[in-house]
Each structure stands twice: as structure tokens, then as C-alpha cells.
Curated annotation (Swiss-Prot):
Every RRM domain range: 12-87
Region annotated Interaction with pre-mRNA branch site, chain positions: 9-22
GO terms for cellular component: U2 snRNP
InterPro entries hit by this protein: Nucleotide-bd_a/b_plait_sf, RBD_domain_sf, RRM_dom, RRT5_SRSF_SR, SF3B6_RRM
Keyword Nuclease recorded: no
Cited function: Necessary for the splicing of pre-mRNA.
CDD domains: RRM_SF3B14 (cd12241)
UniProt KW keywords: mRNA processing, mRNA splicing, Nucleus, RNA-binding
Protein name (record): Splicing factor 3B subunit 6-like protein
Single Gene Ontology MF annotation: RNA binding
Length: 115
């Protein structure tokens, strides 16, 4: 079993990372639709979410097959990172992100950096 599927609760929603910023929804449907009917694809469209997407399959078996086949797949010169969506992990990641932004702001103030 690929590393991306170990210790994850299998479900019909996949979280994709390391996507090209130029990818279109049509290209996503073409790629992920090879493994079964896709109900929805949500591409990240903010600075923090660019290069990520959620792919919702009609059934779990199709999501599992896509996760196994596409994790590490080279697409548009980038290796895809595919995980099953885990809402508990998303909450933790969001908290970590807020803390990292706060720490970054402190460093920027300390050194007088303005971006």
C-alpha cells in the first residue's frame, strides 16, 4: 500500500497537493475522471490554497483507486501528493498555520521587513 494511504480513513474525498498553479478544472476532471465518476472538484484559489484541490468521487472504491494510482504521479512536471480528506487533520493544520503566520509577523516586525 502506498505511504499516502497508511493510517488514513478511506473515504470518497481526496485532498490533492503540489498541483501546478496553471491547472484547470477540465484538466483535473480529465485526470481524476479516469478512475471513476467525479461528483465535484474544488481548486484552491487563494494565496494559501493555490496548488491544492479537493476531489469528491461518487464512491469510495473509485477514490481509493485514484489515491493509489495518482499519489506520486508526475503531472504537469509536478509529483502529486494525494491524501484522503480528514476533517480533524484540517482543523489541526489550520491552527498550525495561524501560529506560523503569527510567528512570521513577529520576525518581520523584529527585522523591519515589509512584504
Amino acid at each position: 500500500m502506498p505511504p499516502s494511504t497508511v493510517n488514513q480513513e478511506v473515504n470518497s474525498i481526496l485532498f490533492i497537493k503540489n498541483l501546478s498553479f496553471k491547472i484547470t478544472a477540465e484538466e483535473m476532471y480529465d485526470l481524476f475522471g479516469r478512475y471513476g465518476p467525479v461528483r465535484q472538484i474544488r481548486l484552491g484559489n487563494t494565496v494559501q490554497t493555490r496548488g491544492t484541490a479537493f476531489v469528491v468521487y461518487e464512491n469510495v472504491q473509485d477514490a481509493r483507486r485514484a489515491c493509489e494510482k495518482l499519489s506520486g504521479y508526475n503531472f504537469m512536471d509536478r509529483y502529486l501528493v494525494v491524501h484522503y480528506y480528514n476533517p480533524e487533520r484540517a482543523k489541526v493544520d489550520g491552527q498550525d498555520l495561524a501560529a506560523r503566520y503569527a510567528a512570521l509577523e513577529q520576525v518581520k516586525q523584529k527585522y523591519g521587513v515589509q512584504l
